[in-house]
Amino acid sequence: MVGLTPQHYGNAIALMTYLASTALADNKFPDCTSGPLSKLAVCDTSRDVTTRAQSLVDAMSFAEKVNNTQYEAPGVPRLGLPAYNWWSEALHGVAGAPGVHFADSGPFSYATSFAQPILLGASFDDELVKQVATVVGTEGRAFGNAGRAGLDYWTPNINPFRDPRWGRGQETPGEDPLHVSRYVYHLVDGLQGGIGPARPQIAATCKHFAAYDMEDWNGVSRHEFDARVSTQDLAEFYLPSFKSCVRDAQVDAVMCSYNALNGVPTCADPYLLQTLLREHWDWDQPGHWVVSDCGAIDDIYIGHNYTKTGAEAAAVALNAGTDLDCGTVFPKHLGEAAEQGLYTNQTLDRALVRLYSSLVKLGYFDPAEKQPYGSIGWKDVDTPAAEQLAHKAAVEGIVLLKNDQTLPLKAKGTLALIGPYANATKQMQGNYQGPPKYIRTLEWAATQHGYQVQYSPGTAINNSSTAGFAAALAAAKDADVVLYAGGIDNTIESETLDRTTITWPGNQLSLISELSNLHKPLIVIQFGGGQVDDTPLLTNPHVNALLWAGYPSQEGGAAIFDILTGKAAPAGRLPITQYPAAYTAQVPMTEMGLRAGGDNPGRTYRWYDKAVVPFGFGLHYTSFEVSWDRGRLGPYNTAALVNRAPGGSHVDRALFDTFRVQVQNTGTVTSDYVALLFVKTEDAGPEPYPLKTLVGYTRVQQVKPGERRSVEIEVTLGAMARTAANGDLVLYPGKYTLQVDVGERGYPTARVSVHGKEVVLDHFPQPPEGR
């Protein structure tokens, strides 16, 4: 999402900073008791949402309407409508943004900072996602109630992680459409306080709609990039998470993206914003609105050259269904566009009614006693329960990639703590962060666990200096155990910054190699959102253990040491594919196709089979055996499956079956187990067939040694279906193989047969001619 503003445009949009202004926020609640607004229906809580919002819009002059189509809305002083800043952020906790104002100290000077979405996604724990989101939503509401933020937040980022070089992959839960879809459903449920609630806790915003996953690659910028995507890939990969967010979770807001899609900038695309979003996904209820990414409406005429003037850009965006400009094109040019007859007053009113309907639902115009979330305040921010949840979220996501029985550590002693993350603080938060009350460093955690720590960073994230190597090696020689903490950070991957390589920085690899030559127990902690090719570490016999920790945030050091010492057992799974370093030379970032063919080696685990570490991989401190609970599965009939779907619901969400497997802990350590269920076929529907597809998962908590659990994995019709070339979601007859886990473990498979005729579960709206 939201953008660092395109600097070459010269727009007067504030850049986001980590430390927000200490001044009080612009957002103050209006006076609906005695002020001018009290005479309007917007303050009458007995009226319906649309009537209330319409009364406010009707009272505005044309100039006042135009002025309030920007994120930094000035309000209408003569009506008693205060200014309102729509731009608040809360990707993994309330974060710095133009609309969020942290105090210097005391109340509202911090908020709980949870693990970045890429690490939370690695937990494959839907209930945990909802719990985290509930806390983030509660704390967001507390800031909003205090006038230190808005009541809407521009989160989550749900673009699937297509290319390993993408700088913002850390903001997403992973690469698989089903996984991202389930993640966002539970996240929005927690943020907003339910599925489509009449009175949401906050308004969430799903972004970036659509096919946005590139910042700046080889001189191609997101501000002018035209993503060429087939209808099949669009429906199968790029849109399912948005369908889940919009149609199923009923989010209140959506953000259109910087890029164009098949020739049309997304914020100017009625096919995306009207045909798909509002009509096909039935998302035109009161209080649902679309905001542009910041500067994206500028891009319509400056980056994409889709229109010649700012007035034309403003009009095409408004007509397409963009309601709010995170920028200044609307307030600067809608007046001129109106004079040219490029849009109607009704279209302008429609946008404003959508926006103010959202604020009506949020209780912005209600007296305190009628606001269901009005009592939320500072007492509800960073509570002990929230801190415990932040710890749990970090622990559950950590993935063990290699272990030769060195872990868990069995004795206290001297520990050499080396690497650019060895004493990291903010670095462990990733991007879109806010100030937390504390950040548990690795050094702090090691001391808490009784280790004598010898700290020596040795090297930076990415440079050519070896000046610190000698001190690091000296510290390692005197230690019982060596812990190297490194990887990548926001100087290598971030918004506006894609990677050009997916290797470990050379200086870090050199230091790790020299440390391994000491033949001391060597554990490497890999930080960062995107993966790096771990081949040099996986093949080095003197690198004894390797963990991926993503961006674990405020509880990072404590969570990692709980794993290292065995206080907690690792059970996270990689939510993305770890590609070999050579992959970046095989396919350009601008190639949006998923399927292998021609010069495209394929993307994601569904179409690429040469991974260094596959999607879904994760080791444990114990061992598990998995077996099928039923000897015979099915047979199934397409017509019968569809006919038994509940009336009034979307048939793709109906149950195909609930599969049961037996999971037994055959080792000696109590551990969670993530049961991933994949399906593959070689005759159901047309070729080419994906290598396999995730159709369901569940996280089994705390399985004790020797314990056997019966685990249920629900699979929907939509998960078993495939996407046709025209985008239709089709359930095909044929033979399917079910596989638990990532395949390397040799767990048994099961075969099922689906009979009958192919059935279309969802007819995908066809794009306009020529697209």
Curated annotation (Swiss-Prot):
Keywords: Carbohydrate metabolism, Glycoprotein, Glycosidase, Hydrolase, Polysaccharide degradation, Secreted, Signal, Xylan degradation. One of its GO terms (molecular function) is alpha-L-arabinofuranosidase activity. It comes from the Eukaryota. Pathway: Glycan degradation; xylan degradation. The keyword Secreted applies. Residues 1-25 form the signal peptide. One of its GO terms (cellular component) is extracellular region. It is an enzyme of class 3 (hydrolase). Gene3D superfamilies: Glycoside hydrolase family 3 C-terminal domain, Glycoside hydrolase, family 3, N-terminal domain, Immunoglobulins. It is found in: Secreted. It catalyses: Hydrolysis of (1->4)-beta-D-xylans, to remove successive D-xylose residues from the non-reducing termini. Pfam families: Fn3-like, Glyco_hydro_3, Glyco_hydro_3_C. The active site is at 293. Its main location: secreted. Glycans are attached at residues 67, 305, 345, 423, 462-463. GO terms for biological process: arabinan catabolic process; xylan catabolic process. Its EC number is 3.2.1.37. Xylan 1,4-beta-xylosidase involved in the hydrolysis of xylan, a major structural heterogeneous polysaccharide found in plant biomass representing the second most abundant polysaccharide in the biosphere, after cellulose. Belongs to the glycosyl hydrolase 3 family. This is Probable exo-1,4-beta-xylosidase bxlB. It comes from Aspergillus clavatus (strain ATCC 1007 / CBS 513.65 / DSM 816 / NCTC 3887 / NRRL 1 / QM 1276 / 107). The lineage of its organism: Eukaryota, Fungi, Dikarya, Ascomycota, Pezizomycotina. The gene is bxlB.
